[in-house]
């Protein structure tokens, strides 16, 4: 897509291939069609294992991927994964590596200002903690009910319809 006459290639980085695809679909719906899918893991369990790595090891993997994306001409990275953006300091990496990186955590810092109470459902405790922390940055008085459930993410990844998920999990 052109922004101000400039064509941009955007990398969609996410925890799994399904998440990457969902992120690309979101961008496509806004006219951003030159996207590169960057799943970090093959499935939610692998992604949770990746997130449990030592900080330095995890960051080294992400830095290598960012270097490869820059070589491919990607100018922006859109991180479409709460838990991944919770365990990697993408704000710092964006500055350090001179690339624009957009994450859900940036949005949560704004969202916290709009509400008094929020319920947060996340794949795992990494994502839940990151979302809560970023909500509280903007609104320390916010009341958050948090739930982490990897099985819910697996159901989404399997392509289950929302109605089926509601029934299966007794929501």
Question: Which residue ranges define each predicted feature?
Answer:
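Non-catalytic structural scaffold of enzyme domains
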Residues: 2-171
């Amino acid at each position: 897509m052109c922004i101000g006459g400039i064509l941009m290639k955007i990398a969609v980085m996410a925890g799994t291939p399904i998440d990457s695809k969902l992120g690309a679909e979101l961008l496509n719906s806004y006219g951003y069609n030159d996207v590169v899918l960057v799943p970090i893991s093959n499935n939610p369990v692998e992604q949770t294992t990746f997130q449990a790595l030592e900080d330095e090891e995890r960051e080294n993997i992400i830095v290598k991927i960012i270097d490869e994306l820059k070589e491919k001409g990607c100018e922006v990275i859109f991180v479409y994964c709460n838990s991944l953006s919770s365990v990697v300091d993408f704000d710092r990496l964006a500055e350090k590596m001179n690339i624009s990186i957009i994450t859900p955590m940036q949005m949560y810092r704004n969202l916290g200002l709009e509400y008094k109470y929020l319920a947060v459902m996340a794949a795992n405790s990494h994502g839940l903690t990151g979302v809560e922390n970023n909500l509280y940055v903007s609104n320390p008085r916010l009341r958050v009910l948090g739930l982490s459930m990897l099985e819910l993410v697996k159901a989404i990844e399997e392509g289950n319809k929302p109605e089926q998920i509601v029934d299966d999990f007794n929501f």
